[in-house]
């Protein structure tokens, strides 16, 4: 089963967990310091909450499509490249308390999208040094929006 991912940067993680638990009628699947995610069955959605530092309002962090296996990530990467989109591929990257394979693209408005599979748990929210995940936005670089913030 594939599902769309919506990652939000929120000013108050605990309040957001409470709100989204009520909204979707289910608690989070994973809670870690500064991070929570919900695996919502209906509608099929992976909702990711990332605590923002000193932010007053919730904002979009990035979008994604969670797939079942690494082969689907590879297929998406090939399809996206063949369609002319610039891609950034990552394999076995630790991000958002998970080990993932993924491919990033950027929409015309600068919105980062990832197609990814979760392969297991990780001990850290932050990215590896060579990963596009969890990188602060830098409007000065051409590929900055690809994987601009985090998962």
From Swiss-Prot:
Q: Which residues bind roxarsone (III)?
A: 61, 95-96
**Effect upon mutating residue 102 to A:** Nearly inactive. High decrease in iron affinity
Comment on activity versus temperature: Exhibits robust catalytic activity from 37 to 55 degrees Celsius.
GO BP: any one term: response to cadmium ion
What are the EC numbers?
1.13.11.-
Keywords, sorted A to Z: Dioxygenase, Iron, Metal-binding, Oxidoreductase
SUPFAM superfamilies per record: Glyoxalase/Bleomycin resistance protein/Dihydroxybiphenyl dioxygenase (SSF54593)
Entry keyword Phosphoprotein? no
State the PANTHER family in the record: CADMIUM-INDUCED PROTEIN CADI
Matches recorded under NCBIfam families = ArsI_CadI_VOC
Note on domains (UniProt): The thiolates of the vicinal cysteine pair (Cys95-Cys96) directly coordinate the arsenic atom of the organoarsenical substrate.
Put simply, this protein is called Trivalent organoarsenical cleaving enzyme
Q: Organism source for this protein?
A: Thermomonospora curvata (strain ATCC 19995 / DSM 43183 / JCM 3096 / KCTC 9072 / NBRC 15933 / NCIMB 10081 / Henssen B9)
Recite the lineage of the species: Bacteria, Bacillati, Actinomycetota, Actinomycetes, Streptosporangiales
């Amino acid at each position: 089963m594939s599902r769309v991912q919506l990652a939000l940067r929120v000013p108050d993680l605990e309040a957001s967990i409470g709100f989204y638990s009520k909204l979707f009628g289910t608690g989070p699947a994973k809670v870690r310091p500064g991070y929570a995610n919900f695996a919502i069955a209906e509608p099929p959605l992976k909702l990711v909450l990332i605590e923002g530092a000193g932010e007053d309002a919730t904002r979009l962090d990035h979008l994604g499509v969670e797939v079942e296996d690494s082969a689907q990530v590879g297929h998406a990467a090939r399809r996206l490249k063949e369609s002319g989109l610039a891609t950034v591929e990552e394999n076995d990257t630790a991000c958002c308390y998970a080990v993932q394979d993924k491919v990033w693209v950027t929409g015309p408005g600068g919105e980062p999208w990832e197609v990814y599979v979760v392969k297991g748990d990780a001990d850290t929210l932050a990215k590896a040094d060579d990963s596009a995940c969890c990188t602060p936005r830098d409007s000065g670089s051409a590929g900055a929006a690809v994987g601009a913030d985090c998962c």
